[in-house]
A protein has these predicted regions:
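Conserved N-terminal structural module of periplasmic/extracytoplasmic solute-binding proteins
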Residues: 1-53, 61-70, 114, 235, ...
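Hinge/lid segment of periplasmic solute-binding proteins
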Residues: 44-99, 123, 150, 179, ...
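Short, solvent-exposed loop/beta-turn-alpha elements that line the ligand-binding surface or hinge
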Residues: 60-75, 158-182, 232-233, 246-256
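Extracytoplasmic/periplasmic substrate-recognition and gating elements
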Residues: 6-7, 32, 86, 109-110, ...
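Extracytoplasmic/periplasmic solute-binding protein
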Residues: 81-93, 98, 123-172, 188, ...
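A local structural motif
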Residues: 6-17, 110-114, 189-202, 233-238
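Glycine-centered hinge/linker elements that transmit conformational signals in sensory
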Residues: 126-128, 169-200
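Short helix-initiation/N-cap motifs at beta->coil->alpha
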Residues: 16-25, 44, 117-123, 199-213
Length: 287
């Protein structure tokens, strides 16, 4: 807004509140090659679709041009680097990490002294919590990415990016990869044994946040993007944290806290003129 006011420019912002509706609309824009000047885009299938139609500005080159490449966090650069050509096509929204939060009072009530370090311990703790009449885990099941996290935990800890890259390339599958098969069984257990909240499949992430931070459920997978919601409970000593557990019986990498760039921004190559480049520099200076 400030940039446009200074330059005497008009601007239009399109808001789509529902995540799945947003993805659908973004795909429509990609299919018709009518992407807006700037658009939110997760790193993955949708960004690849944009790249396939040559619709993305090379953000890495632009950061090198204006001197901000050396100021970019290395983990964020790695996260947004394209696996095919090594370029960076998305501008990071921020630096985020993800982890499990848990309510200490419910753990104590269930006789759980330490946070789980393996998925086997995680499920055992869920049963102890359920035995106390409490909801073990809150999840926003209507937002697919929430459940996908549970499918990704085990292969990520065991193979790093190897499985997901192989899955996308068609060279690996959930039926062939042992860590991925483990993840399928884990998610099945959590859903069928009643460890998720009732009706979890119709609960979106925002509602899941409201449930957990409103006092329902023992465990919630979230991250630094929602840390402000946890402030009161944390200040009162009610919350604990633990990273993604190990997959027992397999060789796990030491990294257990996912780090990412959030919902990154793409710049439409077709409309990236001198004014847009000037705005890009303004973003870098003021973001």
């Amino acid at each position: 807004k400030n940039f446009c006011d200074e330059k005497g420019l008009d601007y239009e912002i399109e808001l789509v509140n529902d995540m799945q509706d947003y993805f659908t609309k973004l795909q429509m824009y990609i299919n018709s090659d009518t992407l807006p000047d700037i658009f939110g885009c997760p790193n993955g299938t949708l960004s690849k679709a944009c790249k396939d139609i040559d619709a993305l500005v090379n953000v890495g080159d632009e950061l090198e041009r204006n001197g901000y490449d050396e100021k970019l966090n290395g983990a964020i650069r790695d996260f947004l680097t394209d696996a095919d050509d090594g370029n960076m096509y998305l501008f990071p929204q921020g630096l985020y990490c993800e982890y499990f939060m848990y309510r200490k009072d419910i753990f104590e009530k269930a006789g759980i002294k330490d946070a789980p370090t393996t998925w086997e311990e995680f499920e055992e703790d869920c049963q102890k919590i359920a035995d106390q009449g409490e909801i073990p885990v809150i999840v926003g099941g209507s937002d697919a990415w929430q459940l996908m996290r549970y499918l990704s935990f085990s292969p990520w800890r065991v193979t790093g990016p190897e499985f997901i890259e192989g899955y996308q390339a068609g060279t690996d599958s959930f039926s062939d990869n042992e860590s991925a098969k483990y993840a399928v069984n884990l998610l099945s257990d959590l859903g069928t044994k009643g460890y998720f909240e009732p009706g979890f499949a119709s609960v979106d992430f925002t509602s899941a946040c409201n449930l957990f931070f409103g006092g329902s459920g023992a465990i919630f997978y979230t991250g630094s993007g929602q840390i402000s919601l946890a402030e009161e409970m944390y200040d009162n000593g009610e919350l604990g944290f633990f990273p993604v557990p190990d997959t027992e019986g397999m060789d796990n990498m030491s990294t257990n806290v996912p780090v990412h760039a959030g919902f990154a921004e793409g710049f439409n190559k077709a409309t990236y003129d001198d004014t847009m480049q000037e705005f890009f520099d303004y973003m870098c200076e003021n973001f």
